[in-house]
Amino acid sequence: KGTDAISVFVNRKGELEITGREPRGPVYAAYKFLETFGVRYWSPWRETVPKASSLAVRDDFRLDHHPPFDWRSGWSVSDCGDSPAMRAWRVKVGHNGSVPADCGGPYQFTYGETITYRYMKPKDHFDAHPDWYAYVEGRRQPTQLCASSKGGLDAFTAEIRAELQAHPEKRFVSLVSADNDQFCQCPGCRKIRARLKGGNAALEVHIANEIARRLGREFPDVQFTVLAYWTKEDAPQNARLEKNVAVGLALGHPHNLPVSKCRVWQQKAAGWEKLARDRLYIWDYYAGFNNFNEPRADFVNIAETMRHYARRGYRGVSAQLALGRTANFGELKAYLWAQFAWDPSRDI
């Protein structure tokens, strides 16, 4: 049971069965089985494969595992590109955010910024409909959408409907605001903030709920995502999320501690758990973005942080790690993160 569950065992005929939940489980099962013989996939460029003339398992051998996270996707020196070696490594370590079709294809979760970038592009609408966009510093600006603009929401709904009709395979659609803090301050949006008792996140939640209500019956298998990030970290206190709205958590925290020991992080996460406990996906950080080569001991917190996410029942995990072949412990962090994303309980 569960996304990407695997099972390896000796059946009654004495045959070794290597299987798992389709579409990716059987492939993961094969690689995890090899790990029991000492094979290690350290990075796309480094592996350990012990030499042996034969392999044998006991009749009672059994390897069963159900990853606690449905979605597991890193962004690191080991998997930030699309080279054949990186594509293969992602499969070997159990990532599923970007998987080739011949290995089962990806788990297509998304929570990247899309508003004004992918949808409702100002070059298409702003000149004719400035009222659809944010009122900032006394004038309409193409920085964000105006959450209280009926015309803007109608146009946004039409764009999302058209995309889902063109791509019926989609299961997640990101409705995340542009990566800036220039949110609408018009009277209508101020009322939304007051009603939901929230800041900028209240506007994103309002937009997502509107889209989710309008399109939910037409596309019942689709989830719409928002992102708790930067000026949107605090959950609106008086909001409810539609059942087809999921949340990404990109909450800042001290990197020298696991999140289970970060009081502020836990307070912010608790606010979102009240809204969508079974629909939370993590966007984490294990890098110093001013200098990837800067020594940082944050990799020692990966295990406990991932165990905390699993205990809380979060649905998926992703992380931005250091990039560049000379990055501080870059390959080691990527390997450890992948191992604990697959099984947070393991001891490495």
Question: Language-model features: where?
Answer:
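Feature activates predominantly on carbohydrate-active enzymes
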Residues: 2-206, 213-218, 248-249, 273-297
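Substrate-binding groove of N-acetylhexosamine-processing glycoside hydrolases
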Residues: 141, 165, 194-348
